[in-house]
């Protein structure tokens, strides 16, 4: 079964038609993958936010009365990291129903366009939060001799392990959001 298709500048070619059930099946598969990746992103962002938000460590200094404490809320970059992950996680939870609509109606175009836009905004927010936290984590591990900032990870090893681990979940969520944007763009491109 073939049909004349206009390619460019009035040229025509014989191209096979893709049966409608196959096209709908591919769209439905993309939508199912979209929902699955959103759930994975929710897990990654909430794990990162909880891991960073519950991080603190106290070390005694000479006596029990004098102690040094390291907690995430002492550093604005870590607070921003927790807030960014929480906002992205909330967005992902709220976007699940719209993604489920795409399973039922794979041809829904405008709602997919809305998801692409907000996915890109959330990717930017998550990247900003993770980048800000990564800079501080690097300073915690390596320090900066020129600025007289010493590495604290030799003393606060549990604190540093937790903040480093929370970055892994956030960067994984960034990769998943990039894949989500590409999937949505693929689904939109197939309709034209």
Curated annotation (Swiss-Prot):
The keyword Cell membrane applies. This is Casparian strip membrane protein 4. It is a multi-pass membrane protein. Homodimer and heterodimers. Belongs to the Casparian strip membrane proteins (CASP) family. One of its GO terms (cellular component) is plasma membrane. Its main location: membrane. The keyword Cell wall biogenesis/degradation applies. Regulates membrane-cell wall junctions and localized cell wall deposition. Required for establishment of the Casparian strip membrane domain (CSD) and the subsequent formation of Casparian strips, a cell wall modification of the root endodermis that determines an apoplastic barrier between the intraorganismal apoplasm and the extraorganismal apoplasm and prevents lateral diffusion.
């Amino acid at each position: 079964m073939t049909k004349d298709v206009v390619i460019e500048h009035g040229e025509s070619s014989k191209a096979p038609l893709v049966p409608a059930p196959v096209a709908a099946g591919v769209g439905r598969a993309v939508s199912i993958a979209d929902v699955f990746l959103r759930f994975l992103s929710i897990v990654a962002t909430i794990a990162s936010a909880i891991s960073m938000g519950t991080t603190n460590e106290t070390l005694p200094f000479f006596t029990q009365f004098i102690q040094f404490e390291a907690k995430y809320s002492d550093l604005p970059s870590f607070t921003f990291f927790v807030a960014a992950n929480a906002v992205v996680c909330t967005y992902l939870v709220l976007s699940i129903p719209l993604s489920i609509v795409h399973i039922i109606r794979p041809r829904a175009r405008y709602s997919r366009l809305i998801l692409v836009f907000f996915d890109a905004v959330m990717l930017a927010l998550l990247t900003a939060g993770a980048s800000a936290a990564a800079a501080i984590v690097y300073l915690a591990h390596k320090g900066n001799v020129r600025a007289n900032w010493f590495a604290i990870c030799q003393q606060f090893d549990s604190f540093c392990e937790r903040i480093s681990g929370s970055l892994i979940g956030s960067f994984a969520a960034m990769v998943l959001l990039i894949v989500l944007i590409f999937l949505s763009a693929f689904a939109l491109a197939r309709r034209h």
